[in-house]
A protein has these predicted regions:
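Helicase-associated low-complexity regulatory tails and linkers flanking the ATPase motor
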Residues: 1-225, 230-421
């Protein structure tokens, strides 16, 4: 059976309750869709919604602690918006003024708290708990992405507020009463922002984005944590991000790659010292207590990697046979094997590593193959060739003429032989 071969996935071990909730959801899905029990049967994404959100956070439910819990019909009360409503009370109009329900405090305690020797958050969300630990250990700004609101962005925000990191605009903080003293960074109160497609949760994305990219926010002095969802994050560019966390996978790697691209841009880290221009990427996944079983998020990463490998094979063929392949051979000099230089970098947790500069074999940018490849045909270009038209100045001066000529040619034919060109 195929395995995850190239992706470096950050695996979190589930605690008893979350593991039990996940297994319960899977059993209910098998009852509803018997074909899932067949080994070769694929899984539709709509079926994965519940299991994926459970692996983000499983909201506690006393029915799940009973002996006959498999006979209970409580699937949707364990995750997402319904699960959140069951354990918390809040103003549904403004989506603020969050408070624990008395029944939640009596039976389970402050479930979003990461404090103490036995933090409650760890029982219900291995991923969010680990993210909180990474925030505490890190210098610089942390970016976290989730596709879900009630099962992702909101519980992340509540967990941050439980540790004392509040919303940039204090009027937008979720808890009605601040549960902790402010968490300090270099003497400043640590803040977070949340950029989503929900206007109630994120009424002023521009203001929060401006604060996050402010030159004075070099190490998270103004905004320590940025929470984003798919709907709210498209087209955004951040600066000086030191950690990127992807809370759950998607069926292909494009979404994760786009999210990483929000924090890794050209000149996005120029304000930082050279040895601190690092971005750590965490692709969060789950390790079940039944270690022989594969969690749904690991399954999705495996499927996504397999797709990416096949796409890479096609991409490599296009590169090898591209009309400008020989002209762009110098691009391959960006590979780590060709550069052959190591530098010492400091991670966000202040640990240092030796890093080899350049593109790596079997990475996305190298099509999950060796980075070096030969053009087809691989002609020798050592003889004198006029390159006066192969430069930026020529393109700038002549781009309109060239485009018009191409359009006219396509009006006549859409296929031309080399001799005609």
């Amino acid at each position: 059976e195929e395995q995850i071969n190239y992706l470096d996935v950050y695996v979190n071990k589930l605690q008893d309750f979350q593991n039990k909730a996940y297994n319960y959801i899977i059993e209910k899905l098998k009852e509803k869709y018997p074909l899932l029990q067949e080994k070769k049967q694929g899984i539709q994404y709509t079926m994965m919604d519940g299991p994926l959100q459970i692996l983000n956070i499983a909201y506690p439910h006393e029915e799940l602690l009973s002996e006959d819990y498999l006979n209970k019909d409580i699937e949707k009360e364990l995750y997402g918006k319904k699960g959140l409503r069951r354990v918390m009370k809040y103003n549904k109009t403004t989506k603020k003024e969050f408070e624990y329900k008395e029944s939640t405090l009596e039976k389970f305690g402050r479930i979003f708290s990461s404090n103490g020797d036995e933090p409650l958050l760890k029982k219900y969300s291995a991923k969010i708990y680990k993210f909180i630990q990474k925030v505490k250990e890190s210098d610089g700004i942390c970016l976290i992405y989730s596709n879900f609101i009630g099962g992702g962005c909101v519980p992340i925000a509540l967990a941050l507020e439980e540790m004392g990191i509040y919303r940039l605009n204090s009027n937008r903080s979720l808890f009605k009463t601040k549960p902790q003293q402010p968490y300090k960074i270099n003497g400043n109160n640590a803040k977070y922002i949340m950029i989503t497609g929900d206007k109630k949760l994120s009424p002023n994305n521009k203001e929060e984005l401006k604060a996050a990219t402010d030159p004075n926010n070099l190490n998270g002095e103004k905004v320590k944590v940025i929470i984003i969802s798919k709907a709210g994050s498209e087209g955004l560019d951040f600066k000086n991000i030191r950690q990127v966390h992807i809370l759950e996978p998607w069926y292909n790697l494009n979404r994760a790659d786009q999210t990483i691209g929000r924090g890794v841009r050209k000149k996005s880290h120029c304000q930082l010292p050279f040895n601190q221009r690092t971005v750590e990427v965490y692709l969060h996944a789950s390790d079940l207590q039944e270690s022989q079983l594969e969690s749904i998020d690991l399954y999705m990463y495996r499927v996504a990697e397999n797709k990416a490998i096949k796409i890479g094979q096609v991409t490599r063929l296009l590169k090898e046979n591209a009309i400008d392949c020989l002209l762009n051979k110098n691009q391959q000099q960006m590979n780590s094997s060709n550069i052959g230089k190591n530098i010492t970098l400091q991670l966000s947790n202040k640990k240092t590593i030796d890093y080899q500069i350049g593109h790596k074999d079997n990475s996305l940018i190298c099509d999950f193959m060796e980075c070096n490849y030969l053009c087809k045909p691989n002609n020798d270009l050592s003889q004198d060739i006029g390159i006066e038209t192969y430069n930026q100045n020529y393109i700038i001066m002549n781009i309109e003429k060239i485009l018009n000529k191409i359009k006219l040619l396509f009006k006549e034919h859409y296929i031309y032989e080399k001799s005609e060109l």
